[in-house]
Amino acid sequence: MGKKKIVTKKEGEADAGPKARSSARSGKKHVSAGTLYVQSTYNNTKLLLTDKDGNALAWSSSGAIGFKGAKKGTPFAAAKVGELIGEKAQNIGIKEVDVVVRGVGSGRESGIRAFISKGIELTTIKDRTPIPHNGPKPRKPRTV
């Protein structure tokens, strides 16, 4: 076994959780309304915040904040992503958002709930999950 490194925290230092991301860019632009795109798959949850023209203001995903493997697809990870994007939206000055949801993952609802818990008003929710019109053959069901 090798040596163990012991890290001592000083006063005033706060634990930022898994991989705290700096949002240095997010303070520059001030927008009052925007659109939140939620892409939720079985393996990951991604949130993208744009202005009304579609220009990206902030984004994050479960993998980007430090979750690995199967934990990325959990509702808890999606809630953490929603909180992070909600804080970035507050810094930008967003007051109301439209939500567009894509995918069938378990983080759909919890990501949105965590986002609106930051005090941002939700105007509409649209479900734009892609549905094939008899495209390629789907995956076989998983056997457990």
Residue ranges and their predicted role:
Residues M1-V144:
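Ribosome-associated RNA-binding proteins
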